[in-house]
Amino acid sequence: MEITKEKLAYLLFLYNQKDTNCTVTRLAEEFGVSKSTFSRVLNSFYHENLIIQKGKGILSIKGEKLTKSYLKDITEIKSWLKSISNFSDEEAYHEALTLVLVLSNKTRYKLITDLYKKKLFEKIDKVKSISGDMLAINLEDGKYSFAFTIYKINKLEISMANDGFVHPGILEIDNGKGNLILFPKEIEHESLLGNIILKGQVESLKYMIDQEFINSRNVKNNYIIPIDRLQFHYCKEERILQTSIKIKVRADVGIIHMPESCAVLNIIIK
């Protein structure tokens, strides 16, 4: 569905008027267009399932969800623009409205998540660490990429397990709960004889909490580690959050089941 600036302006207007129960005539007057123009827009919205009834300015669940997502991003970008410039409220709003439409979805999402992280870092500016459960409460819902490296236990050497996952990983925050998500990928391993390339992938992942290894949940072949009992350390100078957790990884490479090995998963969020 293509969203133009004009179309989004109508959706935002209807969203703000949702509790007024105004007639189409009154809505058109408030918006500053003729009744016929407003009715044509409503007719278009009805065919796109954005309003619940033909000729009524009441957003459907789909329309409200779409509008709220844009409004949330506009609000964040507006606040950011005001913090870095001398824009008035109205100027910042219109610039933010333009930005959410001209940016690609990927760039827009990255900008918004970066702004969310900026707000988090401002909140924890005077602390050296934050628990995972508090991190999940203070960080807006979303999916945040994180860099990670898996090291051999008690060594500054990168573990073979590091190649068993897609980089970066994802920290997913949803309704005050947070999970680290690791995406396994195909591993290539040269046989001891050196003439055969064996292929496979991570078969199981365990993580240590309170000196006990716990099986990671596997959802759609992705490994999930809850963050609620992890401790994140904050570096103010570099604006990064970092945590480490011991893990056990077992890989299935061809006909060979490689033994379960211990390693350290080091995570950086910036």
Report each predicted region and the residues it spans.
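Short alpha-helical segments that sit at the start of domains
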Residues: 1-10
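Short amphipathic alpha-helical elements of helix-turn-helix/winged-helix folds
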Residues: 9, 13-17
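Short acidic, hydrophobic short linear motifs in intrinsically disordered regions
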Residues: 19-30
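Basic amphipathic alpha-helical segments that dock to polyanions
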Residues: 27, 37-48
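Basic, amphipathic "hinge/linker" alpha-helix immediately C-terminal to the N-terminal HTH DNA-binding motif
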Residues: 55-73
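N-terminal soluble domains immediately following signal/targeting peptides that reside
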Residues: 132-179, 183-270
